Amino acid sequence: MSESNELIEQRIQKIEELKKQGINPYPVRFFPDSKSKDIAEKFEKNPTGPETKFKLGGRLHSKRVMGKASFAHLKDNSGIIQLYATKDDLGETQYSIFKSLDLGDIIGLEGYLFKTQKGEITLHVTSVELLSKCIRPLPVVKEKDGVVYDAFADVEQRYRMRYVDLIVNDHVRDTFITRSKIVSEIRSFLTQEGFLEVETPMMQPIAGGAAARPFVTHHNTLDMQLFLRIAPELYLKRLIVGGMDRVFELNRNFRNEGISTKHNPEFTMMEAYMAFGDMSTMLDLTERLITHLAQKICGTLKIQYGKDLIDLSPPWKRTTYVDIIKEYSGIDFSQIISLEEAKKKASELKVDVSKCQTIWKVADEVFSEKAEPNLIQPIFITDYPKELSPLAKSNPDKPGYVERFEPYVAGREIGNAFTELNDPFDQKERFEDQVKQREAGDDEAFMMDEDYIRALEYGMPPTGGLGIGIDRLVMLLTNSHSIRDTILFPLMRPE
């Protein structure tokens, strides 16, 4: 029997022993009235005596049994506090229970505070109760020379068993607490800007709003094929048509694509649409929102991301899509007239463009490989090719291009925005072009959406739209270097 299995058997045996004593190892309820951090801070300012009792609940973090007295530490979701328990205070039965506790056990305690001779605030335990047994031993975390070592260092295992990861790694829990604050702050900011939060379908008869492969499902009663949404965009713009002038949705999207440090098939997106807005109003909104979040969450506009100090102070740099590709690859795609020439130049840079069917698809691969990783400081990339932007309004001053921008920071895209195309005739032509690309083998090309065309035929005001990837934004604001570090339960291969 392995050491781990032997420990599990020992802990199960302890449960059986408690049952024989008539003690329920999984009692129905226990109501703490305090948090360890709160009572310690208050005690430091205003010490209390044995007459002031506190009830705490949490996990046993450490334990030292010394005959008739024991020291231990309790960890709750606010912090860690030292415990002092004696046989005289607890009595034979409860002290026996206390001594038999294992690290990780969830316990309920009552007691009063005092300071040890070393000055550590400690809970003098007067009552103890096992609330839930930790049957499986927790990984042991150790620190040496500022580096943390534990038996849970395998990243894949941490993602797969996030519940254990959260128990043993405080920084992981802190990341997800920060994520929650970011999401709440986004909602608050947009609400103050006059946006109304709405919900649109997760299952859609047509996968639209983005260039991506969808997940396919089937509705049995209606006998119809449905897609998990790849984006909410076309439904949100239907609401603009309906007179809801400022709307946003913060929810999940699903794309049947690869997994990487920047991609997870299930991810969170915020999309906002503003009637009588355009690319410039959404650019201003993006800059204000992200700088607001940085100041609110990080307390500064200069944040450390890996080895880079990123300065989010406005105004952010701006440059065009064509110019940024030329800067980092030497290729001016605006001057290339044949697909063969585009592929040749890309291949010389060792960029795989074998599946690209158009010049601008080649350009986009070159951008992703050569330019994007270098965009560390915040920058808005503007003036995208019309071909790559089937839902964006054409730029009247630059034929072949659209009023679109994408914000980049820390070497990755964190959003996408444009002046929305509201001409139903132009939109139908672009959908038709996308259908041709789809028929030619591009399974990420858009599908035709006749109902959306019909909605535009009722008239949509000039509109600005914005999408921001929440997971990537959280990566930036928490100094996380994989998207899976910002998603509680990322998709994993089967064990």
UniProtKB/Swiss-Prot annotation:
<dbReference type="InterPro" id="IPR018149">
    <property type="entry name" value="Lys-tRNA-synth_II_C"/>
</dbReference>
<keyword id="KW-0547">Nucleotide-binding</keyword>
<dbReference type="InterPro" id="IPR034762">
    <property type="entry name" value="Lys-tRNA-ligase_II_bac/euk"/>
</dbReference>
<keyword id="KW-0067">ATP-binding</keyword>
<dbReference type="InterPro" id="IPR012340">
    <property type="entry name" value="NA-bd_OB-fold"/>
</dbReference>
<dbReference type="Pfam" id="PF01336">
    <property type="entry name" value="tRNA_anti-codon"/>
</dbReference>
<protein>
    <recommendedName>
        <fullName>Lysine--tRNA ligase</fullName>
        <ecNumber>6.1.1.6</ecNumber>
    </recommendedName>
</protein>
<dbReference type="InterPro" id="IPR002313">
    <property type="entry name" value="Lys-tRNA-ligase_II"/>
</dbReference>
<keyword id="KW-0479">Metal-binding</keyword>
<keyword id="KW-0963">Cytoplasm</keyword>
<keyword id="KW-0436">Ligase</keyword>
<dbReference type="InterPro" id="IPR044136">
    <property type="entry name" value="Lys-tRNA-ligase_II_N"/>
</dbReference>
<dbReference type="GO" id="GO:0004824">
    <property type="term" value="F:lysine-tRNA ligase activity"/>
</dbReference>
<keyword id="KW-0030">Aminoacyl-tRNA synthetase</keyword>
<comment type="similarity">
    <text>Belongs to the class-II aminoacyl-tRNA synthetase family.</text>
</comment>
<dbReference type="InterPro" id="IPR045864">
    <property type="entry name" value="aa-tRNA-synth_II/BPL/LPL"/>
</dbReference>
<dbReference type="GO" id="GO:0000287">
    <property type="term" value="F:magnesium ion binding"/>
</dbReference>
<keyword id="KW-0460">Magnesium</keyword>
<dbReference type="GO" id="GO:0005829">
    <property type="term" value="C:cytosol"/>
</dbReference>
<feature type="binding site">
    <location>
        <position position="413"/>
    </location>
    <ligand>
        <name>Mg(2+) 2</name>
    </ligand>
</feature>
<comment type="subunit">
    <text>Homodimer.</text>
</comment>
<dbReference type="InterPro" id="IPR004365">
    <property type="entry name" value="NA-bd_OB_tRNA"/>
</dbReference>
<feature type="binding site">
    <location>
        <position position="413"/>
    </location>
    <ligand>
        <name>Mg(2+) 1</name>
    </ligand>
</feature>
<feature type="binding site">
    <location>
        <position position="406"/>
    </location>
    <ligand>
        <name>Mg(2+) 1</name>
    </ligand>
</feature>
<dbReference type="GO" id="GO:0006430">
    <property type="term" value="P:lysyl-tRNA aminoacylation"/>
</dbReference>
<dbReference type="GO" id="GO:0000049">
    <property type="term" value="F:tRNA binding"/>
</dbReference>
<dbReference type="GO" id="GO:0005524">
    <property type="term" value="F:ATP binding"/>
</dbReference>
<dbReference type="Pfam" id="PF00152">
    <property type="entry name" value="tRNA-synt_2"/>
</dbReference>
<keyword id="KW-0648">Protein biosynthesis</keyword>
<dbReference type="InterPro" id="IPR004364">
    <property type="entry name" value="Aa-tRNA-synt_II"/>
</dbReference>
<dbReference type="InterPro" id="IPR006195">
    <property type="entry name" value="aa-tRNA-synth_II"/>
</dbReference>
